[in-house]
Swiss-Prot record:
Belongs to the kinesin light chain family. Residues 32-150 form a coiled coil. Residues 602-616 have a biased composition (Low complexity). GO terms for molecular function: kinesin binding. TPR repeats lie at residues 55-88, 208-241, 250-283, 292-325, 334-367, 376-409, 461-494. It comes from the Eukaryota. This is Kinesin light chain 4.
Length: 616
């Protein structure tokens, strides 16, 4: 056994043992030490027996005791070696366990690194999506602000279009007069169609007029995919046959601009109108009514894009041209003043706004009479300007004047039996303060209020809402509720006779009710707003009659029937006689072409409607 242990020590000095070799050698040495320990134990027992047999004090007894001590010392060393070997084996097991745990931890670290990388990728993707979402939110907020702006414009529209359901004050004003189409603006020059043709030096071909009618119908039906190619093809043909600088090309550019305007493509429409303006200035002169119409339409496009400063000088120049051509007291000059006032109001130039509205009001009252709807509309606009400046007393006075005048037109007088609606509202307010504990007022006691609700028109409805809001601001809740309920009742009454008159016109049955006055240049149309579904038309016969269109759906139905007649005309078949009046839905305004009327009676050719001015 001693030789085995010594043999383990005889390894070359330069050889480096591995951990497995060390553990194997340790186990062998431990086994050898155990055997050696057993051998020493047996020898020690033998010596102990020998000592007992020997006599005391003998020489041999001392030697045996010495051997026993040596054996015990050797056994202690052997036991120490065994203990160290066991410690080494236990340490090896512990190190093996630690290494195993270490490998497990490394595997976990690798998994965590992979998961961390995946989370980083997910975070990067999420950040990108968040950035795109924030951009989308910013874009939607801009669109929301734009839509709120349009909604606020419609709240101040006095023509009672589809947005009159909304209530409350608006921070922007309606551009109700700011985008009359060229067909509406062109007659505003006060000249006859024949005179306009002489001014321009050319006559619009019948084919272009027919094409224009088709484009208007397609646009009114929302079929822009058909209307736009038609316009572009016609424009290419006209440029090829007549040249780029011909006035008829400018007319076609205006038609295409109107189609783009219907698609809310204001930038493209503005480019086309700029081209048309250049052509008309070079061919017709800078002071031609057609130039004024194009300037007005271009100013509107800038206004719809919020560029009021750029729009104001264009509108101002259009006003100067119309004053020069038509005179300072023409109704179309008043209409241009309304447009200019609205632009100034959106810029906060309230002093100029009041000046323009008062001048327009004086023109309307002097030329058309105090009962003309445009007088009420202008007063309503002026009252809105007062509201923005906090001049509530002045605004309230104008609103009451509008309602009182409408009441007088309906009932003939103001007395105890026939009171305007605002008087009933204030009486109910006073009564509510006295009888606030008794609930609602009996029907019979306030029958006059329900009778006063019969006074209804778009301007009156708008005035009712605005005055109701003003009453609420003053704390007159009962009076405000009375006016609001009256406005609501009038909207629920359905199609009124005025709407039926407009529909009859569209069907060719209302020609007898339309007269034009040479001195005033026919009829002037006012658009109710950007997306209005109702348009109001003033007939220049001095009667002050207000003609209001029906809903957009009814207009489209009429346009579909009219399109069939135009298609038959293009195919060569004769349509049955009917009125050639063709009206366009409110989003694209109305197109009025009285072909049966004599040229000297109809309104003058304004630049934007030259394509419709002459008959085939």
């Amino acid at each position: 056994m001693s030789g085995l242990v010594l043999g383990q020590r005889d390894e070359p000095a330069g050889h480096r043992l591995s951990q497995e070799e060390i553990l194997g050698s340790t186990r062998l040495v431990s086994q050898g030490l155990e055997a050696l320990h057993s051998e020493h134990q047996a020898v020690l027992q033998s010596l102990s027996q020998t000592i007992e047999c020997l006599q005391q004090g003998g020489h041999e007894e001392g030697l045996v005791h010495e051997k026993a001590r040596q054996l015990r010392r050797s056994m202690e060393n052997i036991e120490l070696g065994l203990s160290e070997a066991q410690v080494m084996l236990a340490l090896a097991n512990h190190l093996s366990t630690v290494e195993s745990e270490k490998q497990k931890l490394r595997a976990q670290v690798r998994r965590l690194c992979q998961e961390n990388q995946w989370l980083r990728d997910e975070l990067a993707g999420t950040q990108q999506r968040l950035q795109r979402s924030e951009q989308a939110v910013a874009q939607l907020e801009e669109e929301k602000k734009h839509l709120e702006f349009l909604g606020q414009l419609r709240q101040y529209d006095e023509d009672g279009h589809a947005a009159e359901e909304k209530e409350g004050d608006a921070s922007k004003d309606s551009l109700d007069d700011l985008f009359p189409n060229e067909e509406e603006e062109d007659p505003s020059n006060g000249l006859s169609r024949g005179q306009g043709a002489q001014h321009s030096g050319y006559e619009i071909p019948a084919r272009l007029r027919t094409l224009h009618n088709l484009v208007i119908q397609y646009a009114a039906q929302g079929r822009y995919e058909v209307a736009v190619p038609l316009c572009k093809q016609a424009l290419e043909d006209l440029e090829r046959t007549s040249g780029r600088g011909h006035p008829v090309v400018a007319t076609m550019l205006n038609i295409l601009a109107l189609v783009y305007r219907g698609q809310n493509k204001y930038k493209e429409a503005a480019l086309l109108l700029n081209d048309a303006l250049s052509i008309r200035e070079s061919t017709l002169g800078r002071d031609h009514p057609a130039v004024a119409a194009t300037l007005n339409n271009l100013a509107v496009l800038y206004g719809k894009r919020g560029k009021y400063k750029e729009a104001e000088p264009l509108c101002q120049r259009a006003l100067e041209i119309r004053e020069k051509v038509l005179g300072t007291n023409h109704p179309d000059v008043a209409k241009q003043l309304n447009n200019l006032a609205l632009l100034c109001q959106n810029q906060g130039k309230y002093e100029a706004v009041e000046r323009y509205y008062r001048r327009a009001l004086a023109i309307y009252e002097g030329q058309l009479g105090p009962d003309n709807p445009n007088v009420a509309r202008t007063k309503n606009n002026l009252a809105s300007c007062y509201l923005k400046q906090g001049k509530y007393a002045e605004a309230e006075t104008l609103y009451k004047e509008i309602l009182t005048r409408a009441h007088v037109q309906e009932f003939g007088s103001v007395d105890d039996d026939h009171k305007p609606i605002w008087m009933h509202a204030e009486e109910r307010e006073e009564m509510s303060k006295i009888r606030h504990r008794e609930g609602s007022t009996p029907y019979a006691e306030y029958g006059g209020w329900y009778k006063a609700c019969k006074v209804s028109s778009p301007t009156v409805n708008t005035t009712l809402r605005n005055l109701g809001a003003l009453y609420r601001r003053q704390g007159k809740l009962e009076a405000a509720e009375t006016l609001e309920e009256c406005a609501l009742r009038s909207r629920k009454q359905g199609t009124d006779p005025i709407s039926q008159t407009k529909v009859a016109e569209l069907l060719g049955e209302g020609d007898s009710g339309r007269t034009s006055q040479e001195g005033l240049g026919g009829s002037v149309k006012f658009e109710g707003g950007e997306d209005a579904s109702v348009a109001v038309e003033w007939s220049g016969d001095g009667s002050g009659a207000l003609q209001r269109s029906g809903s957009l759906g009814k207009i489209r139905d009429v346009l579909r029937r009219s399109s069939e007649l135009l298609v038959r005309k293009l195919q060569g078949s004769e349509p049955r006689p009917s009125s050639s009046n063709m009206k366009r839905a409110a989003s694209l305004n109305y197109l009025n072409q009285p072909s049966a009327a004599p040229l000297q009676v109809s309104r003058g050719l304004s630049a934007s409607s030259m394509d419709l001015s002459s008959s085939s």
